[in-house]
């Protein structure tokens, strides 16, 4: 598997996509105040803007390409102005080509001002949520939409709560191993095509499935398996953080494989370092059980700081030190030295 693939990133999303999907993903509802072709309005930035200064007339540093949030402060400022001042201030505000305007806390906007936004081709939405809650949800949504992402060939499994990305050359049996893990009670996130996203500037990688393939698996010799229908809702996961990468390798006598586990290999995915476990495949090897142990070892190290290889090494070192302490010290007296040289 090529781990060096560069991450991809969306350049923009439509306001129509934003309006539809954010309400599905979060506990927030929006209502349209005007009717426009939202497919033509696009959001290019993940950051939001509170345009208080811009409404007041200072537009020198106005980041108008962002989603504009009008909360209590902005709407009350507009309401305290006279009719002519309000029209002038809002006309100046909507003269900039912004993606959309969102009113929070059910704040009202005069219909005349809404019509001005409609004339400028700017969608206006309203929500009952507070500005703080609205900004939190929208930022989280846009953060994910504009995150780095890449598609990897493999399987993503939730094993004992640990996100394991199973990779390797085609034909080595990744799907069969994943199916065996599902039968043992673990959860399938994705098979064949795994979509991995790096959330914002964090070191967190989140894996999800391809929406077309969904939770179907292709098993050679058997055909297509619907994991959800065959094993029930417990056998699938919507998304999972990638915590360990397991690479299946063809067995080779010439190759040297890790035997103790003291040297932890790492692999970089989308700029994030992850532990890599390479497992050679040969007849009679129970890969499923080994992957379960890989997950348990990760939990031991993550929560208890315990590494079996280091514990065994320390035990051997202690035994050697005890044996050395029991052995009689060699004599180095001056008389014995002279006797030996007479």
Swiss-Prot record:
The Walker A ATP-binding motif also binds Pi and PPi. InterPro entries: HPr(Ser)_kin/Pase (IPR003755), Hpr_kin/Pase_C (IPR011104), Hpr_kin/Pase_Hpr_N (IPR011126), P-loop_NTPase (IPR027417), Ser_kin/Pase_Hpr-like_N_sf (IPR028979). SUPFAM superfamilies: HprK N-terminal domain-like, PEP carboxykinase-like. It comes from Chlorobaculum tepidum (strain ATCC 49652 / DSM 12025 / NBRC 103806 / TLS). It catalyses: [HPr protein]-L-serine + ATP = [HPr protein]-O-phospho-L-serine + ADP + H(+); [HPr protein]-O-phospho-L-serine + phosphate + H(+) = [HPr protein]-L-serine + diphosphate. Residues 280-285 are annotated as: Important for the catalytic mechanism of dephosphorylation. PANTHER family: HPR KINASE_PHOSPHORYLASE (PTHR30305:SF1), PROTEIN YJDM-RELATED (PTHR30305). Catalyzes the ATP- as well as the pyrophosphate-dependent phosphorylation of a specific serine residue in HPr, a phosphocarrier protein of the phosphoenolpyruvate-dependent sugar phosphotransferase system (PTS). HprK/P also catalyzes the pyrophosphate-producing, inorganic phosphate-dependent dephosphorylation (phosphorolysis) of seryl-phosphorylated HPr (P-Ser-HPr). This is HPr kinase/phosphorylase. Homohexamer. Belongs to the HPrK/P family. Mg(2+) binds at residues 175, 218.
């Amino acid at each position: 598997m090529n781990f060096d693939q560069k991450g991809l990133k969306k350049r923009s999303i439509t306001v129509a996509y934003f309006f539809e999907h954010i309400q599905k993903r979060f506990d927030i509802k929006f209502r349209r105040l005007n009717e426009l072709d939202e497919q033509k309005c696009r959001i290019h930035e993940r950051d939001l803007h509170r345009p208080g200064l811009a409404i007041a007339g200072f537009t020198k540093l106005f980041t108008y390409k962002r989603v504009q949030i009008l909360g209590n402060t902005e709407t009350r400022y507009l309401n305290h102005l006279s009719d002519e001042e309000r029209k002038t201030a809002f006309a100046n505000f909507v003269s900039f080509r912004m993606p959309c305007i969102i009113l929070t806390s059910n704040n009202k906007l005069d219909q005349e001002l809404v019509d001005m936004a409609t004339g400028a081709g700017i969608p206006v939405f309203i929500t009952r949520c507070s500005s703080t809650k609205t900004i939190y949800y929208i930022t989280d949504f846009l953060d994910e939409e504009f995150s780095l992402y890449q598609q990897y060939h493999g399987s993503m499994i939730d094993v004992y709560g640990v996100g394991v990305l199973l990779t390797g050359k085609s034909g080595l049996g990744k799907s069969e191993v994943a199916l065996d893990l599902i039968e043992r009670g673990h959860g399938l996130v994705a098979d064949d095509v795994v979509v991995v996203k790096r959330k914002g500037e964090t070191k967190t990688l989140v894996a999800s499935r391809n929406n077309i393939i969904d939770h179907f698996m292709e098993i050679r010799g058997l055909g297509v398996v619907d994991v959800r229908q065959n094993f029930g809702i417990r056998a699938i996961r919507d998304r999972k953080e990638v915590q360990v990468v397991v690479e299946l390798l063809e067995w080779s006598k010439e190759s040297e494989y890790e035997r103790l586990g003291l040297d932890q290999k790492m692999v970089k995915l989308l700029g994030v370092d992850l532990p890599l476990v390479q497992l050679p495949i040969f007849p009679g090897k129970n890969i499923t059980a080994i992957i379960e142990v890989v997950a348990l070892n990760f939990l031991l190290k993550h929560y208890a700081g315990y590494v079996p290889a280091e514990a065994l090494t320390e035990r051997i070192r202690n035994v050697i030190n005890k044996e050395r302490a029991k052995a009689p010290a060699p004599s180095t007296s001056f008389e014995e030295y002279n006797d030996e040289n007479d």
